[in-house]
Amino acid sequence: MASLSPHRTALIVVDVQKAFDEWEAAGKRRNNPDAVKRIVQLLADFRAKRAPVIHVRHASRDPASHFWPDQFGFAVKDEVREQPGEPVIVKHVNSSFIGTDLEVRLRQMGIDKVVIVGATTNHCVETTTRMAGNLGFKVKLVRDATWTFDREGVDGELYTADQIHAMTLANLREEFAEIVAADDVMRRLGTT
């Protein structure tokens, strides 16, 4: 992976919200248990190098959802809370770009590369990654700073979070994003 200029690369933190803790407490199994720790490391690195950080939160339009703004689950996880000056984008669909000013903000900042982390790999992270690629951004999707949950298939078969995560990364690889590890990003951010 080539170097990443801190002036042209933004970290996009997608939906790292407490609702996912509620899912785990209800017995849903996830992969990448250290993903949030990796996100915290990336946040520290981007902030230290004064590279832009943008936070995205999902606000459901369904009052019964864990992501409803008045629910506990809407809140961001404490360890990834935004710092002063870091924008927070609130979205209502899977894409961080639809119905938001994310693209405009990135273009106004002169950003041409985005590093995407968060949850879940096969929903909002995947949709945001595809759209960022389609909009012409060079996307780095951080495989160890994203996660998903087990899912039941249409015929009742179980797909593990690891299987879903791996297939999603395979689908996005090359056409929409470069799949990278957090350590790779931290090693390349700001190097010449």
List each language-model region with its residue ranges.
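Active-site-adjacent betaalpha module
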Residues: 1-10, 37-44, 48-49, 61, ...
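N-terminal nucleotide-binding beta1-loop-alpha1 segment
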Residues: 10-16
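Generic enzyme active-site microenvironment
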Residues: 13, 55-56, 142
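Short beta-to-alpha linker loops that shape the active-site pocket of alpha/beta-hydrolase fold enzymes
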Residues: 17, 59
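Short acidic/His/Gly/Ser-rich catalytic and metal-binding motifs that mark active-site loops
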Residues: 19-22, 149-151
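Acidic/histidine-rich helix-loop elements
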Residues: 21-33, 156-158
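Charged, well-structured alpha/beta interaction segments
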Residues: 28, 36-39, 52-54
